[in-house]
């Protein structure tokens, strides 16, 4: 191509579009679709879960032995009862296959369900190995104000792949 071809092509293009006017806006305003009630509730749950569970917080948890934690001011006998399986979990949560964001939501929902149903103990199954959830779940549990203690579950409740969690449900009229 040379400059004469460019000039000729430009002249043809100008002749073709001569007299064409741009489209004018018809003043129609498009509204964004309203969020459904489910979307709003999901967003609130995520906000609620994120307010309790930070991924950057690193509590001091045992490196050796079974995973365990006891809130300050709680009798150490409670941890022993969890270890022996004296508490029977009323609610179970299986986190296999969940992403971290989904697991946080489910964990927050489980703790709320325990409080609502007056369930003192629950079991959280995070899986074997050294996966992300196995590392993150104890760190998240330590941060929640309703969690009094947790211990690696006995064999009948999942052993290394699960935690038994003691929940603060307020005043209990009787012991389970």
Curated annotation (Swiss-Prot):
Sample GO molecular function, one term: rRNA binding
SMART domains xrefs: SMR
Domain Smr: from-to ranges: 93-168
EC code: 3.1.-.-
Transmembrane stretches, start-end: none
Signal peptide (UniProt feature, chain positions): none
Record SUPFAM superfamilies: SMR domain-like (SSF160443)
Annotated Pfam families: Smr (PF01713)
Any one GO BP annotation for this protein: rescue of stalled ribosome
UniProtKB keywords: Endonuclease, Hydrolase, Nuclease, RNA-binding, rRNA-binding
Function: Acts as a ribosome collision sensor. Detects stalled/collided disomes (pairs of ribosomes where the leading ribosome is stalled and a second ribosome has collided with it) and endonucleolytically cleaves mRNA at the 5' boundary of the stalled ribosome. Stalled/collided disomes form a new interface (primarily via the 30S subunits) that binds SmrB. Cleaved mRNA becomes available for tmRNA ligation, leading to ribosomal subunit dissociation and rescue of stalled ribosomes.
Family to which the UniProt record says this protein belongs: Belongs to the SmrB family.
Subunit structure: Associates with collided ribosomes, but not with correctly translating polysomes.
Designated name of the protein: Ribosome rescue factor SmrB
Species name: Shewanella baltica (strain OS195)
Gene coding for it: smrB
